[in-house]
Amino acid sequence: MLNSPVVILSFIGAVLAGGFTVVYLQASHKTQLIKLLLAYSGGFMLSIAFTHLIPELYAHQSFQIGYFILLGFLIQLILEFFSGGIEHGHVHVHKNQKFPLALFLSLSVHSVIEGVPLGNMLEGISDPHGHHHDMESLFLGILFHQIPVAIALMTLLIKSNPSPFKAWLFLAAFALMTPLGVLVGMFVPAESLGLNQDIILAVVVGIFLHISTTIIFETSENHKFNLLKLVSILIGCLFAFTLNWL
């Protein structure tokens, strides 16, 4: 059973693990293993959106929930205008370039938004009408995606800032963003903002759809698949399918 300490520590640990692989294992956002992990996360996120989250939303809401899924898709499109697509591993780094603060803030907003519906689910764990069955899939979808994003961010931090301390400081701040969203979801009732949990989840589903489809089509050079990346995407999809029977 998931609980808030496990969720929060897992997200923080995933981001710091991404930074560790860059600093101590000399990995980067261009490393083959990282590209495969990104492809896997894209397949997983796309599958849980279609097989878990969207069916659950439409079971509780009318067709109008689709507007909020579209809103989430468009929000992510706007955020990527500032982030440069770092959410799906698309980042260009140059030695000693100035760190783009807008990118960091955009990525942070993205991470906070993702955490909010998970916090709603954790707070409503005893609610018989809550999305308990999808809490694990949403948690895993965010978690799997955090590691390659953290690797891309740490790569950019190292190239743009000569101070290792500052690089780790920025990464640690980013590691707290999704947990912050979880806490907001737990302690700030959606109703107090004139919303409900389904609307917030629908926005995140839209974000998932944008990121996962972009990952799938941009996961290799020249937008061409190779076999390993295709297999990684399929494994991500299959793992999401198995959650229906766990």
Segments (PLM) and residue ranges:
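Intrinsically disordered, metal-sensing/regulatory segments
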Residues: 1-246
